[in-house]
From Swiss-Prot:
PANTHER family with a match to the protein in the record: 60S RIBOSOMAL PROTEIN L3-RELATED, LARGE RIBOSOMAL SUBUNIT PROTEIN UL3
Assembly, per entry: Component of the large ribosomal subunit (LSU). Mature yeast ribosomes consist of a small (40S) and a large (60S) subunit. The 40S small subunit contains 1 molecule of ribosomal RNA (18S rRNA) and at least 33 different proteins. The large 60S subunit contains 3 rRNA molecules (25S, 5.8S and 5S rRNA) and at least 46 different proteins. uL3 forms together with ES39L one of the contact sites for the signal recognition particle that targets ribosomes to the endoplasmic reticulum membrane.
Biased composition (Basic and acidic residues): 1-10
Region (Disordered): 1-34
Protein name: Large ribosomal subunit protein uL3A
Family: Belongs to the universal ribosomal protein uL3 family.
GO cellular component entries: cytosol; cytosolic large ribosomal subunit; preribosome
Compositional bias segments (type: Basic residues): 18-31
Length: 388
């Protein structure tokens, strides 16, 4: 085109303003799936830590597609999900202004890693959190039972307080992540009893999600610091002879009103924003104690999901994990909230059964050639370090 364009759509969406850093690193669940009393009692969300990415090979099962029954290669994300510990229950009452919490009941004993969540400086603190509350159990459980009965009588929504076991991961952080998870299925009394029975007990990922399920991933994206207008909004570079910079917006508004409108693309913070990624498919839920959690029917080699040398900047996955199709928000080590989907899925892609043929476990530090240490030893033979 040899002439100027006088009209074009704006660059960048205004629906995500303000583009500022997220207030907290853990993804917030702003809506839970609709409750169904006919189903058994179950949790609707789970927390995990992003370990890294790899790739898999599988046969596409999509009749009518040109790739039907042919091998395809896909990128996958591995999220480590140690069992979560239930430490409390919260009851919510429906009001004209929405849900309002009625009362909260905590467990008798709380671990140190979750108590750290209530202190800014654990080292200098007196560490007396929940000491008075624990006396209610020692003296009499009448007050505890009274609060639980209030939840059964007045509340319509029940959520449990559960925290991660961050000490079981390679992360250096000692402070566990705590969140409210809605309990769906059964009556309100069933939910309260389920929560009471699971006080100070663990809940694993397999009791919440299952193979081939479509879920949502909520987290905070990778932070990029301050970026210019072109990188932040995707505006067009100006011509070469433009005065005072090319990666800018040439006109930032009219003379009047005598201020810059909020819709004008400007430089500022990029990344580290709260995002909800919909419709991620679970390809595998692996057990941490399974020595063949990366093996398949096609590839019977005994190997774990951790690549040779460990996941880059993460380490070794020793707990339960979930493998999701594609990428997820945030860098490695970022805590991610996995939530059951709010939608009823009917598409062929969502209902397609997934059967993995091969999972790559080669080193991610370079061009890895070997899938297991035994394979590398067989190819390289005896090395000097083995003799010494």
């Amino acid at each position: 085109m040899s002439h100027c364009k006088f009209e074009q759509p704006r660059h960048g969406s205004l629906g995500f303003l303000p583009r500022k850093r997220a207030s907290r690193q853990r993804g917030k669940v702003k809506a839970f799936p609709k409750d169904d009393a006919s189903k058994p009692v179950h949790l609707t969300a789970f927390l995990g830590y992003k370990a890294g990415m790899t790739h898999i090979v599988r046969d596409l099962d999509r009749p009518g597609s040109k790739m039907h029954k042919r091998e395809i290669l896909e990128a996958v994300t591995v999220i480590e999900t140690p069992p979560m510990v239930v430490v409390g229950v919260v009851g919510y009452v429906e009001t004209p202004r929405g849900l309002r919490s009625l009362t909260t009941v905590w467990a008798e004993h709380l671990s140190e890693e979750v108590k750290r969540r209530f202190y800014k400086n654990w080292f200098k603190s007196k560490k007396k959190a929940f000491t008075k509350y624990a006396k209610k159990y020692a003296e009499s459980t009448q007050s505890i039972n009274r609060e639980l009965e209030r939840i059964k009588k007045y509340c319509s929504v029940v959520r449990v307080l559960a925290h991660t076991q961050i000490r079981k991961t390679p992360l250096a952080q000692k402070k566990a992540h705590l969140m409210e998870i809605q309990v769906n299925g059964g009556s309100v009394a069933d939910k309260v009893e389920w929560a009471r029975e699971h006080f100070e007990k663990t809940v694993d990922i397999k009791s919440t999600f299952e193979q081939n399920e479509m879920i949502d991933v909520i987290g905070v994206t990778r932070g990029k610091g301050n970026e210019g207008t072109t990188a932040r909004w995707g505006t067009k570079r100006l011509p070469r002879k433009t005065h005072r910079g090319l990666r800018k917006v040439a006109c930032i508004g009219a003379w009047h009103p005598a201020n810059v409108q909020w819709t004008v693309a400007r430089a500022g913070n990029a990344g580290y924003m709260h995002r909800t990624q919909l419709n991620s498919k679970i390809y595998r839920i692996g057990a941490g104690d399974d020595a063949k959690n990366a093996s398949t029917d096609f590839d019977a080699t005994e190997k774990r999901i951790t690549p040779m040398g460990g996941f880059v900047r993460y380490g070794v996955v020793e707990n339960d994990f979930v493998m999701l199709n594609g990428a997820t928000p945030g860098p490695v080590k970022r805590v991610l909230t996995l939530r059951k989907s709010l939608l009823t899925h009917t598409s062929r892609k969502a209902l397609e059964p997934v059967s993995l043929k091969w999972i790559d476990t080669a080193s991610k530090f370079g061009h890895g050639r070997f899938q297991t240490p035994a394979e590398a030893k067989q190819f390289l033979g005896t090395l000097k370090k083995d003799v010494a």
